[in-house]
Amino acid sequence: MPAARRFPWLFLAILAFGAVADLVSKSIVFRVLPHEWDSQTVWAPFFYLKNQRNTGGVWGIGNGANGIFLILSIVAILAIVIYLSVAAFRGQRLPLPLAGILAGAFGNLWDRIQFGFVRDFLSVRIGSFHWPTFNVADSLICIGCAVMALGLLCAPEPE
């Protein structure tokens, strides 16, 4: 699994770029589409930008439970930071996918604290199938988890 060494510049770059990309993209889209449910076709009939406010978790599960998801986000971020601190202290390599996961968690946590909801805006449709609206932070979390899972599944057996 790719990892940052003692000075985790690549890890920090992924973390910073991911968090900034998420927050800036949300800010731009929500400035262009200021009202909830506003939408703009990007590539008909597949891809749209949409102002959607999510007070729940993934796919809107637990809608209205922003406080619970705010606490869960803080716990997840603290767990990752503690893990990274222990790994760095022991001189272990830092898994780069955690940088993306952490960046996404920070982006969505910022939204929950600042607005009381997560700003989702990427909407994908294929025929009658409509994927739940998401954002850059969600993508970073999913990609980070997928890369970590792949790394764990493909890692050689310890001797």
Descriptions of predicted regions:
Residues M1-E159:
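Alpha-helical transmembrane bundles and membrane-interface segments of multipass inner-membrane proteins
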